[in-house]
């Protein structure tokens, strides 16, 4: 992401969540509650789906070959979700502790998974990306959503 504002008008960061299959549902609830408080309900469905896909990717990336969380030094991996706005754009970030980079896979028609980043790409009009996190989690995947209206009381 380029050109982050010096200060966000509003932000909401969840506490770390265990990288479990339940994490995307909790992330969706956070998105819905935060956007309701910010009076941005027109973005609910899109942001909720994108964050859910990114959270699911973080959970999957944090799993071992058997699909269970890959504990490191006795600790469960975590993901974390943050929402930020400057009034013109909403940014959703999902951090995870998994190595590797997010890759659009281009699955076949018969594949049951692998479409998450394609969905994110389409719903954000390609306004998404990722970066390595300097401390703590291994990476952050972000997505931007333009805010279609300006409301001076939207973030109070």
Regions found by a protein language model. Give the residues of each.
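Bergerat-fold GHKL ATPase/HATPase_c domain
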Residues: 1-49
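Conserved polar catalytic motif of the HATPase_c/GHKL fold
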Residues: 53, 57
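Short, well-ordered amphipathic alpha-helices
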Residues: 32, 58-59
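Conserved beta-strand-loop-beta-strand hairpin that lines the nucleotide-binding pocket
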Residues: 1-12, 59-156
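Short secondary-structure capping/turn micro-motifs that flank functional sites
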Residues: 51-52, 136
